[in-house]
Amino acid sequence: MNKALKALGVLTTFVMLVVLIGGALVTKTGSGLGCGRQWPLCHGRFFPELNAASIIEWSHRLASGVSIVLVLSLAFWAWRKVTPVFRETTFLAIMSIIFLFLQALLGALAVVFGSNALVMALHFGISLISFASVLILTLLIFEADKSDKKLVKPLRIGRKMQFHMIGLSIYTYIVVYTGAYVRHTKSSLACPDVPLCSRLNHGLPSHFQEWVQMGHRTAALLLFVWILVAFAHAVRSYKDQKQILGGWIAALAFVVLQALSGIMVVYSEMATGFALAHSLFIAGLFGVLCYFLLLIARFRYESKQRNI
């Protein structure tokens, strides 16, 4: 496969991650209106004023603009080169473009017209899908060489494993939404203790922001347990399937790091590094789970072809 295409895929994935983390930084620092209610200009100018909020918001917009050019280039090039090897390339190319523009549109509308926490939480979720689409498209580009050399072992995914993969992909997105809602309702520090909310009221939440925070923690705990169960199933039954076993090892690592960074967000009183790491690890986890969905689609197609 063309080395330049691989390089473009890696660069585009990195820039999409920068956009995702940049959006989290905008929320963390309250810089959403750093350029006022104007888009794409910043207080009527192309270059921002020299203050932190304006620079953070403008940099996020700049990265988003660069990502549009890169994603369009990658999608078209991958569609031309990789589709003959992997039929799912077309779908991923379209997905990456649609969700990228949807993400940009929501961000622009939020700046110009304002928005509420529910919609802004959705903005992060759409950004996550956009990133995952580009990540998987890049993985396909690298896998195309292995496929040509027939190094990819035929997939075997049972119904139980498919249930874990599909169910966790959907449920993780829900947990992501609750986490984004925590940030946009300013509930990140509503509960100063872990695992209970506080030392008052028997550790139970007593007002809206505490309920939002504890709801997210409960959902995240269930996510951790579910991934642990799926990982154990993979270890028992899929040792010969490196893509699946390796994926679950990565998923478990990401969810552990996600939990630890979430705890440190509370104890560090939302230190920027831990807050951004929290977004980074969930992006990695969601990317792995979306790759599992690709494997399921590929397995079902191959099974159908064998039965014809």
UniProtKB/Swiss-Prot annotation:
Transmembrane ranges, per UniProt, are: 7-27, 66-86, 93-113, 122-142, 162-182, 215-235, 244-264, 276-296
Q: Please state where this protein is localized.
A: Cell membrane
Q: What is its EC number?
A: 1.17.99.9
Per the record, ranges on the Cytoplasmic side are 1-6, 87-92, 143-161, 236-243, 297-308
Protein family according to the UniProt entry: Belongs to the COX15/CtaA family. Type 1 subfamily.
The opening ranks of the lineage are:
Bacteria, Bacillati, Bacillota, Bacilli, Bacillales
Subunit annotation: Interacts with CtaB.
Per the record, the pathway is: Porphyrin-containing compound metabolism; heme A biosynthesis; heme A from heme O: step 1/1
Native source organism of the sequence:
Bacillus velezensis (strain DSM 23117 / BGSC 10A6 / LMG 26770 / FZB42) (Bacillus amyloliquefaciens subsp. plantarum)
* Protein's UniProt keywords contain Transmembrane helix: yes
Instruction: Tell me its cofactors.
Output: heme b
**What's the protein name?**
Heme A synthase
